[in-house]
Each structure stands twice: as C-alpha cells, then as structure tokens.
Amino acid sequence: MTAERIVEGVKESLGIMSDDTDINNQIRGKAIAVMNYINNGGGNITPENATEYEIQAIALGVNDLLNQNGSEFSEGFKAMAAQIQLRGGENDKI
C-alpha cells in the first residue's frame, strides 16, 4: 500500500470524488499529520502496512481537521487512535 492508496481511502471514506491536485495534496498533508499523531502516541502505521481500520481512523482525523472542531480531535477519533496506539508495533493487525 502506498501513500496514494491512503489518500484514496481517506477520500473514499469522506465521500470526496474530486481528483484535483490541490485537494489531493491537502488530503495527503492532513493524512500524514494524522498518521504521525497516531504514531507519536505509540502506533506503528506506515503506508505499506496500513489496515482498513487504520485508514478509517486516519480519515476520521482528517475529517476533524477539515471541519476544525475547536482545537481537538473528536472523541471517536481519539478512541480509534488509542486502540491503534495500545496495539503499538504488534503484527496482529485488526
């Protein structure tokens, strides 16, 4: 899986149909930021090993950033991120 597959997965999850370069770049940047946020808390997501669950978590975080819900991520994203972070580098992915 590549970074582009994560971008496409996030766009699909959010219902974004456009293939505009600027939109893709914005989604890519936010997806990388969310992935780094999860990884900095103990997660182990890479474009090569991202599961569907992890892509959905990234999409939820990207949605929060796009909607700028105050200064925090949503409770749903925090719960999904915590599950990924607790699992850490384990190979048994969801």
Role assignments for model-derived ranges:
Residues 1-94:
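Divalent metal-cofactor coordination and adjacent catalytic microenvironments
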